[in-house]
């Protein structure tokens, strides 16, 4: 079913993007897509004071984390099993804005991002386009990060074998009140809604992953599908539930 959005119909680039992702013009739509400074951005028209949401792998917070974020000592790296001589092939089944996928790719993993919502997929594709063209990170980004648009459940069933790790970060109601999380989560939950079928992701993820499934959860959330993980890596506000199938080597 086509998604209604507002956009400048006089701007050929926007018209092309919306046609590609089957987004239909609606003068009364809550969300607007803009293309400014070679960047696609999403805006909530009900909250005009909020900045637009973009996917940016080249500058800002993700670039800072790539350079100064702790490398393979980060909790997410430990959770997916990154260690010397081991760089897993990962499917990120709930890509969102691609931040976790980018961290893993920057540490050497090959990552396929799966995103079902066409507006979010359009933002991801735009972010990848700019990253692929970047002199500093473009070469390895083209090698290690790709986008698959479709429902996670469908995608996990159809993706080729040879996947070491499936990473899941289902949408969950956030208690965090930080400005960034509030802004992005408000927009995301209005646009996408909660992942009501998230519990159904675990079984196909376990079937696809040859080594392990990693589920990122807020520290107050229950286990996905009520299944107890093999091990848990805790951070300040989140935890990584790890379901191990076989050893990393």
From Swiss-Prot:
Specifically methylates the guanosine in position 1516 of 16S rRNA. This is Ribosomal RNA small subunit methyltransferase J. GO terms for biological process: rRNA base methylation. Keywords: Cytoplasm, Methyltransferase, rRNA processing, S-adenosyl-L-methionine, Transferase. One of its GO terms (cellular component) is cytoplasm. GO terms for molecular function: 16S rRNA (guanine(1516)-N(2))-methyltransferase activity. It holds the Pfam family SAM_MT. Signal peptide: none annotated. It catalyses: guanosine(1516) in 16S rRNA + S-adenosyl-L-methionine = N(2)-methylguanosine(1516) in 16S rRNA + S-adenosyl-L-homocysteine + H(+). S-adenosyl-L-methionine binds at residues 99-100, 115-116, 151-152, 169. SUPFAM superfamilies: S-adenosyl-L-methionine-dependent methyltransferases (SSF53335). The keyword Transmembrane helix does not apply. Its EC number is 2.1.1.242. It is an enzyme of class 2 (transferase). Gene3D superfamilies: Vaccinia Virus protein VP39, YhiQ-like domain. It comes from Shewanella oneidensis (strain ATCC 700550 / JCM 31522 / CIP 106686 / LMG 19005 / NCIMB 14063 / MR-1). Belongs to the methyltransferase superfamily. RsmJ family. It comes from the Bacteria. The keyword Glycoprotein does not apply. It is found in: Cytoplasm.
């Amino acid at each position: 079913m086509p998604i209604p959005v507002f956009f400048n119909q006089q701007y050929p680039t926007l018209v092309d993007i919306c046609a590609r992702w089957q987004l239909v013009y609606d003068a009364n739509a809550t969300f607007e897509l803009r293309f400014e400074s070679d960047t696609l951005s999403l805006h909530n028209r009900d909250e005009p004071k909020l900045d637009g949401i973009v996917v940016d792998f080249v500058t800002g917070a993700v670039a800072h984390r790539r350079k100064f974020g702790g490398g393979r000592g980060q909790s997410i790296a430990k959770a997916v099993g990154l260690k010397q001589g081991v760089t897993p092939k990962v499917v990120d089944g709930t890509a969102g804005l691609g931040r976790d996928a980018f961290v893993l790719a920057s540490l050497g993993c090959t990552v396929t991002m799966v995103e079902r919502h066409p507006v979010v997929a359009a933002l991801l594709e735009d972010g990848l386009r700019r990253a692929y063209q970047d002199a500093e990170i473009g070469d390895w980004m083209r090698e290690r990060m790709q986008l698959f648009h479709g429902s996670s459940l469908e995608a996990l069933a159809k993706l080729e074998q040879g996947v070491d790790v499936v990473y899941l970060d289902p949408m969950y109601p956030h208690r965090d009140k930080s400005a960034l999380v509030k802004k992005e989560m408000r927009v995301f939950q209005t646009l996408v809604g909660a992942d009501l079928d998230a519990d159904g992701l675990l079984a196909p993820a376990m079937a696809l992953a040859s080594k392990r499934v990693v589920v990122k959860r807020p520290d107050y959330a229950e286990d996905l599908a009520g299944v107890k993980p093999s091990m848990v890596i805790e951070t300040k506000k989140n935890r990584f539930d790890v379901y191990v199938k076989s050893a990393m080597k």
